[in-house]
Amino acid sequence: MAEAKTHWLGAALSLIPLIFLISGAEAASFQRNQLLQKEPDLRLENVKKFPSPEMIRALEYIEKLRQQAHKEESSSDYNPYQGVSVPFQQKENGDESHLPERDSLSEEDWMRIILEALRQAENEPQSAPKENKPYALNSEKNFPMDMSDDYETQQWPERKLKHMQFPPMNEENSRDNPFKRTNEIVEEQYAPQSLATLESVFQELGKLTGPNNQKRERMDEEQKLYTDDEDDIYKANNIAYEDVVGGEDWNPVEEKIESQTQEEVRDSKENIEKNEQINDEMKRSGQLGIQEEDLRKESKDQLSDDVSKVIAYLKRLVNAAGSGRLQNGQNGERATRLFEKPLDSQSIYQLIEISRNLQIPPEDLIEMLKTGEKPNGSVEPERELDLPVDLDDISEADLDHPDLFQNKMLSKSGYPKTPGRAGTEALPDGLSVEDILNLLGMESAANQKTSYFPNPYNQEKVLPRLPYGPGRSRSNQLPKAAWMPYVENRQMAYENLNDKDQELGEYLARMLVKYPEIISSNQVKRVPGQSSSEDDLQEEEQIEQAIKEHLNQGSSQETDKLAPVSKRFPVGPPKNDDTPNRQYLDEDLLMKVLEYLNQEKAEKGREHIAKRAMENM
């Protein structure tokens, strides 16, 4: 009996794990298919089936029995506590406190407990009340198949869905309908009665927390009113000034005030900076104005100096013009006095002899005798000219001499006239240098000695005269030390040449005084007498013999010079001859020479005035 009992127990123990494994496999396959049908990705972890505490105890007891039977220690492949959460463990511990101890139970009690657990597991889906479920699991009746596309779930064939009408293993941890949203499920779960009960509960809770909530509500209401008023104001402002502001919302009042204060501060700073700049500019402009006034005063002083110089220059020119006229009159009076004053022929011969012995031209010798100076003496200092009081005299004086300034400053070609050409250019018509020399009984210009008419300077070295203008500054004028010595030397030579011309005229006047018959010959020419040419020839021969005897120590060249002079100026009274044209020619030449000398003297005075004006500048 004992052996049969042990065999029966072994068969029962071997069948129990098989039954348990079969039921667990069916439950696992059903649970997996159901999860794949609903939400395989989202609810896979929450839908795990946890075993009941009775099942766990039964499995533990079966393991112990098998270990005792086979006397082998082996670890079970299945961990009964795997996946069990802490609340289940706490619940298990709580249940164990009410259950009897393991050792006190017999094998029959354990078998009975296992069978009851299996029966409960089989009857659990059938005995579940349908009132707690708001809707069935039939997906064909409750919602269309097209809604599955929105939830991106896998579509199962219809033949499988018909057989899958089992309830879920854990209703608490899974949603009834996975294709419905959470808010839809909540709305369907709460009936009007439940909502009414909830409302009453909330009202009771509100009464309990009434005072605090009222204060908070008041604050919230006031804040809402304040914000509503501000919104209304801003809306009105935006509507009224939408075009100006561009449709943007207005800033709050505090920000406006801050921005206005910042703008006022900026404006005040800008105004202060502008005022400082204006003050600086005023100071600078005041300094500049003082400097400009000083410059204006200096320019006025300079202009006044220039104007005074110009006025003085013009006055001197006017006085020079007047003095030139006086000199012309004085020259005429001097010539008349020379004509009236008789000259001795012996004095003339003595002068000629002295000039020959000293190798000095007769003109220079006469000048030396006149001035009482040595040949290389200094030029007589020139006296300052008196200035007229009124400037109106300038225009009156210039009426008679329109080319006064041009003749003084520059020639027509723009360059100063050379002394050699000055005489030839200013000669009157019908009068040449050869005629004058023939009239004086001297050689022609081609055969003259260079010592008698020297050319003391070269034409290439002639400096052009600098015209003066009132606007010319002092810095633009050439320094006096650079050009004045040469100019002074040139002017001295030019004055010497003019003096020679003047002395030539004086010499000619003396000759005319010596032989006054030439002056009275005008009437004789008008009524020529009847005299023979033979008597004239005889008288001329007598004069030549007397001169040769007086100048027996002279050279043949001097005698040749004096021969034509004696021929030109006979000693005795003129006799009637047959050559009246010759006498007319001599008279005309003398008149032209006198006019030329007067003109040259006037020009000399003008040049002298211009030179003095240039030196005083």
UniProtKB/Swiss-Prot annotation:
Compartments reported by the entry: Secreted
Basic and acidic residues: compositionally biased ranges: 92-105, 258-284
Sequence segments annotated as region (Disordered): 68-105, 120-143, 258-290, 407-427, 551-582
Propeptide stretches in the record: 28-30
Record-level Gene Ontology MF annotations: chemoattractant activity; cytokine activity
Any one Pfam family match given in the protein's UniProt record, by short name: Granin
Keyword annotations from UniProtKB, A to Z: Calcium, Cleavage on pair of basic residues, Phosphoprotein, Secreted, Signal, Sulfation
Residues with Phosphoserine modification: S174, S268, S432, S532, S555, S556
Residues that bear Sulfotyrosine: Y151
GO biological process: angiogenesis; eosinophil chemotaxis
Residues making up the signal peptide according to the UniProt record: 1-27
UniProt GO cellular component terms: extracellular space; secretory granule
Subunit structure: Interacts with Secretogranin III/SCG3.
Role noted for this protein: Neuroendocrine protein of the granin family that regulates the biogenesis of secretory granules.
Something else known: Binds calcium with a low-affinity.
Family of this protein: Belongs to the chromogranin/secretogranin protein family.
PANTHER family per the UniProt record, alphabetical: SECRETOGRANIN II, SECRETOGRANIN-2
UniProt name for this protein: Secretogranin-2
Organism (species): Pongo abelii
Gene: SCG2
